[in-house]
Amino acid sequence: MGATLRELSWQGRPLISGFGRRDLPFGYQGAVLAPWPNRLANGRYRFGDKELQVPLTEPERLNALHGLVAFAPWKVTTTEPESVTLTHRIWPQRGYPHLLDLTAHYRLGEHGLTFTLTAVNAGDTAAPYGGSFHPYLVAGAGSVDDWTLQVTAERYLRVDPDRLLPVELAPVAQAGYDFRAPTSLAGVTVDHAFTDLDFDDAGAATLRLLGPNGRGVAMSWDRSCPWLQLCIPNEHNPTMNRKAVAVEPMTCPPDAFNSGVDLIVLPPGGTHELSLTISPLD
């Protein structure tokens, strides 16, 4: 279901919050997100000369959340001892009248697990597109409050408190979301997108999540994702309450189908690829 990453561990130590083979995932655990990540206000947008409406999948906030494929059936096309490839076709449908072919590829290597998502516009009209991946990272046993997080992002996206839709960009230091140095997550509540990320000479941005013993997990991603969503589940989600951190590199911010910010428009035959790696820290 959904080409979802269900479990990932290193030497018996979980690197993500997983779930059982017969269980439903919590809050998009390990999901592939396309053709848009995050929230689309009212499920409504304009593309070209058409006003379009997709179903509301977060009805309590009047949003369409995380695209169309997170709970769709994908086809396993190739398997190797260290890799698997899955594919899914988005057929033209209500609110998204486009034909997209998606390929999700997972590969285990010496640096960890690398995930690649490729989108190809198989239709004959241009298509709006955004993508992301939604694992919940864990730095060991215990609570998020015992961990530290580091990611170099200069600005975050303020959201309205009721619908969690974008309001404006602000410096991270203005709201206690400055993780440019290793920062304790004790008492921190966050469900925001970050940008102005620091990409190194190899073109990678990196987030590090460490437990009190100095062990943890890292995620690195390429320039195809200039945005990062961070979310710490709270008491409203008792099964995951402060037990993991959702880390979601995104090609675009929330509601990009309306704002146009970093929105990808795939021409017929056009291709987009994003890639990230989850690695253990010892």
Annotate the PLM regions.
Residues 1, 88-141:
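Acidic, contiguous internal or C-terminal segments within carbohydrate-active enzymes
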Residues 1-51, 57:
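Acidic-aromatic substrate-binding/catalytic surfaces of carbohydrate-active enzymes
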Residues 4, 63-77, 148, 185-259:
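Acidic/His-leaning functional-site neighborhoods
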Residues 45-53, 117, 265-281:
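Short Pro-Gly-centered flexible turn/kink motifs
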Residues 53-54, 136-223:
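Active-site/ligand-binding surface loops and adjacent short beta/alpha elements
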Residues 55-110:
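Extended, loop-rich substrate-binding clefts of extracytoplasmic carbohydrate-active enzymes
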